[in-house]
């Protein structure tokens, strides 16, 4: 019996019906229409207040009032658009074949493209006037000094206002569209796996999950199935990856970044010395990792120069190779979180009771795992449960993000 047989029964699926009953519900269509109108009004407000690149000059009380209005509205509209996007993505991420959801998701991306140039304009404006000086005359700036300083620093790596607006608009048919194509193609890919108890057609997330199956024959069968499956979509997948990275390289160059790495480090608030220290630690640890891999190969019956087989790369050790049921995995996470504190421990049951989690691998569902902020202090957690210790760790990891989101609830 494989983990796919033993553990997919009654795995949880998330529900967002308490926010809107469906994509066709009047409440949702009204909210989407309101968001469109609010986004257009926000652009008009930024034009009215002249929130854009300007010459350095002394800050006035009028600037403080402008900052208060702009930031309040930007936060309000952004929160509303984010809620709509995540609501729709809850369907797209679990069923990429849902045509209505795909169409509406494209509309939410259009809203993102409308709002994105406004953050660039705000960055130029606060960089010119100075965050600290604006904070003296604006309560909103005072309350958001940290993110606004980051935004002001970003102004040194922006194109002109017109170019940033064009980049946002073109992304809809560029990197954003290519990214959706990649997700659609890979989520809808399935393949036949020659399992010990007979051939089965499985979606790719489920096939990937078999890489941690206790049975080496299952792991090898899954590996062989992957090698047969991926070449069938290699042309569109390669095209999407090249297009997305090509756009990023071009934009980073036009924005004055010396390398794509520097742009990524800034976006993730990681300094170059910190990055280099981490890289140095990884490099110095590689001999230990190689020794461990050779030891693991021997434990799996593959001693000698050929070393660890690909299908055993993430396999459990033979002595610990057991399947983990969903309930067992949840218990492990609950106990570990409870050891930290009752609030974190209680989050596990709350996430289950309130249907935050979608755990079942299935055709049309995005691979991997993620946690997305949703509404109030609530998150959505996507998993592709495979019944392994790795799946248990992934569940803990994503619920850890959910806990982080609860602590950030209400912040802008």
Predicted feature residues:
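A sensor for short, sequence-defined functional sites
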Residues: 119-122, 126, 340-344, 410
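Long, positively charged low-complexity segments
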Residues: 348-349, 382
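A well-structured
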Residues: 1-318
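Short pre-active-site segment immediately N-terminal to the catalytic Zn-binding motif
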Residues: 321-326, 332, 374-396, 410
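Catalytic zinc-binding patch centered on the HExxH motif and its immediate surroundings
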Residues: 322-324, 357-377
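Inter-helical turn/loop segments and adjacent helix faces that build the functional surface
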Residues: 272, 299, 406-412
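Active-site recognition of the HExxH zinc-binding catalytic motif
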Residues: 22, 256, 386-408
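Long, K/E/R/D-enriched contiguous segments that form extended
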Residues: 295, 299-345, 404
């Amino acid at each position: 019996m494989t983990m796919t047989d033993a553990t997919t029964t009654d795995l949880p699926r998330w529900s967002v019906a308490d926010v809107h009953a469906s994509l066709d519900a009047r409440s949702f269509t009204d909210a989407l229409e309101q968001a469109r109108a609010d986004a257009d009004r926000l652009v008009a407000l930024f034009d009215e207040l002249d929130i854009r690149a300007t010459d350095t000059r002394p800050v006035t009380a009028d600037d403080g009032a402008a900052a208060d209005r702009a930031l309040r509205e930007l936060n309000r509209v952004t929160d509303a658009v984010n809620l709509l996007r995540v609501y729709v993505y809850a369907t797209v991420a679990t069923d990429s074949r849902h045509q209505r959801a795909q169409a509406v998701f494209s509309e939410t991306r259009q809203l993102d493209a409308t709002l994105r140039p406004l953050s660039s304009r705000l960055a130029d404006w606060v960089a010119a006037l100075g965050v600290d000086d604006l904070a003296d005359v604006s309560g909103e700036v005072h309350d958001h000094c940290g993110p606004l300083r980051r935004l002001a620093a970003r102004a040194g790596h922006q194109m002109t206002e017109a170019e940033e607006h064009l980049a946002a608009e073109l992304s809809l048919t560029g990197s954003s569209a290519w990214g959706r194509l990649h997700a659609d193609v890979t989520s809808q890919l399935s393949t036949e796996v020659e399992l010990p108890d007979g051939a089965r057609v499985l979606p790719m997330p489920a096939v990937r999950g078999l890489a941690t199956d206790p049975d080496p024959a299952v792991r090898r069968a899954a590996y062989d199935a992957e090698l047969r499956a991926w070449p069938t979509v290699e042309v569109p997948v390669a095209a999407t990856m090249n297009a997305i990275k090509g756009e990023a390289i071009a934009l980073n160059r036009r924005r004055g970044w010396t390398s794509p790495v520097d742009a990524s480090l800034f976006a993730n608030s990681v300094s170059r010395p910190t990055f280099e220290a981490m890289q140095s630690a990884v490099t110095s640890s590689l001999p230990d990792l190689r020794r461990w891999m050779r030891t693991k190969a021997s434990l799996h019956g593959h001693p000698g120069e050929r070393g660890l087989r690909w299908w055993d790369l993430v396999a459990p050790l033979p002595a610990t190779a057991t399947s983990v049921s969903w309930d067992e995995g949840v218990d492990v996470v609950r106990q570990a979180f409870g050891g930290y504190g009752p609030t974190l421990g209680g989050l596990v049951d709350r996430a289950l009771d309130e249907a935050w989690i979608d755990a079942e691998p299935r055709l049309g569902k995005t691979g991997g795992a993620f946690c997305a902020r949703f509404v109030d202090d609530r998150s959505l957690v996507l998993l592709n449960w495979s019944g392994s210790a790795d799946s248990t760790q992934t569940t803990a990891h994503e619920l850890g993000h959910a806990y982080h989101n609860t602590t950030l609830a209400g912040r802008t």
